């Protein structure tokens, strides 16, 4: 897992985002077991309390479920991945549009730029 964290967002949320991206890319699937808190802390080089907070937040959001004595698993709800994809897409687009507006681009210029970029131009 990439552990270069930004200072602008709490680390536990950045780790959750990394897991969300893995879910959307289908690197993790509903029912998959996540590493234990200790294992994830070692992988990400953060305090186990940070990982516990990450897992608790994801459980609060319904993304994971903790099974006593077994560990933490991706929730087996089919709609989770679609909801996450929509949420992450919206966040990326909001950031993109905000930055483009700060540069003074119009909606048409943004769309033309996207078209040119995606067509390899």
Curated annotation (Swiss-Prot):
Pfam families: GntR. SMART domains: HTH_GNTR. InterPro entries: Tscrpt_reg_HTH_GntR (IPR000524), WH-like_DNA-bd_sf (IPR036388), WH_DNA-bd_sf (IPR036390). Residues 9-77 form the HTH gntR-type domain. GO terms for molecular function: DNA binding; DNA-binding transcription factor activity. Residues 37-56 bind DNA. This is Uncharacterized HTH-type transcriptional regulator YhcF. The gene is yhcF.
